[in-house]
């Protein structure tokens, strides 16, 4: 997990850099809650308690955390379509799921702004592209219940933060590009 409040005994804590907070500030808290390993940026300052756990230093904590999460959760739907763009992602993944279903592929799902939608499954989400650990857990959960085809939204934030790294995407689709989210990306 990348949230020190969710750490339990035996967990890996990913100390991710953020725009407002740096996860390395929460390493001691994560260790107190039972983390046995921490993933940190190679230049991070470590608390004294870090000597008691495995420390993995890297130049890209977000990318490496996604790769670790994909290895930990292992299972993924056989076919994944990721859709990005300023607008139209939600409609596009919904259309893809509907087209699969109409063509006889009933083991299909969509994941994004509206949450997760599949036959017999409806879970609401908080982010267009879930955080890294949640995304890879969701991919594994969907595969475990027999979902073979997934259309998912890939937000620009999610892509920039490497949340989808480790996901076995077969097809990537781009809807459009406009000036939205320049507060985050700064330029086009």
Give the predicted meaning of each segment:
Residues 1-67, 71:
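N-terminal leader/targeting and accessory segments in enzymes
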């Amino acid at each position: 997990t990348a949230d020190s409040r969710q750490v339990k005994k035996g967990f890996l804590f990913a100390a991710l850099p953020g725009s407002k907070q740096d996860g390395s500030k929460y390493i001691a808290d994560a260790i107190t809650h039972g983390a046995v390993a921490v993933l940190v940026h190679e230049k991070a300052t470590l608390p004294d308690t870090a000597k008691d756990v495995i420390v993995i230093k890297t130049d890209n904590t977000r990318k490496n955390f996604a790769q670790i999460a994909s290895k930990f959760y292992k299972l993924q739907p056989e076919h994944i379509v990721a859709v990005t763009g300023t607008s139209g992602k939600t409609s596009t993944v919904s259309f893809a799921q509907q087209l699969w279903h109409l063509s006889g592929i009933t083991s299909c799902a969509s994941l994004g702004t509206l949450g997760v939608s599949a036959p017999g499954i409806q879970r609401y989400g908080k982010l267009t592209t879930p955080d890294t650990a949640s995304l890879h857990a969701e991919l594994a959960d969907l595969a475990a219940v027999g979902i073979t085809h997934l259309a998912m939204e890939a937000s620009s934030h999610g892509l920039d933060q490497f949340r989808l790294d480790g996901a076995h995407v077969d097809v990537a689709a781009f809807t459009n590009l406009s000036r939205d989210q320049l507060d985050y990306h700064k330029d086009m």
